[in-house]
Amino acid sequence: MSRVAKAPVSIPAGVEVKLDGQLLTVKGKNGELSRTIHNAVEVKQDNNELTFSPREGIVGADAQAGTARALVNAMVIGVTEGFTKKLQLVGVGYRAQIKGNAVALSLGFSHPVEHALPAGITAECPSQTEIVLKGADKQLIGQVAADIRAYRRPEPYKGKGVRYADEVVRIKEAKKK
């Protein structure tokens, strides 16, 4: 059995978990998330714990049990604490601002880029060169951050572009004569 799946997911106070067949719904102060658990995984709810075990005779069930446990744990953390992702804009004239339910980016193109935010994700700009994304769905926050970064990825010679706050951009040496 997967080492990750052996540990049960504890359900904190204020979080409501509903298991309907293979559909798991987690509800908390930050919203509601639901996910369909793979058929190779058996989920049991005992008091304030969820346990995940692989079904017998299915190839890859151990791996699916560990994956399901990690995804559900992220859902529980998301509805209680939430997740944040920080982006930095590095470059002359690179700016960001919030316009309603979208992030307006000035990234050196001839036109400003507007990225609409999906439901459940909020953004704020503490400064013109910083974007902070917040929400309950870890996967969705990562996807939105990756989409914004894809408009202008950091280039390797000067490091200009949109980068994650914890990302280290390796700078190449310029060509010598």
Swiss-Prot record:
Coiled coil: none annotated. GO terms for biological process: cytoplasmic translation. The gene is rplF. PANTHER family: 60S/50S RIBOSOMAL PROTEIN L6/L9, LARGE RIBOSOMAL SUBUNIT PROTEIN UL6M. Keywords: Ribonucleoprotein, Ribosomal protein, RNA-binding, rRNA-binding. GO terms for cellular component: cytosolic large ribosomal subunit. Pfam families: Ribosomal_L6. InterPro entries: Ribosomal_uL6-like, Ribosomal_uL6-like_a/b-dom_sf, Ribosomal_uL6_a/b-dom, Ribosomal_uL6_bac-type, Ribosomal_uL6_CS. It comes from Pasteurella multocida (strain Pm70). GO terms for molecular function: rRNA binding; structural constituent of ribosome. This is Large ribosomal subunit protein uL6.
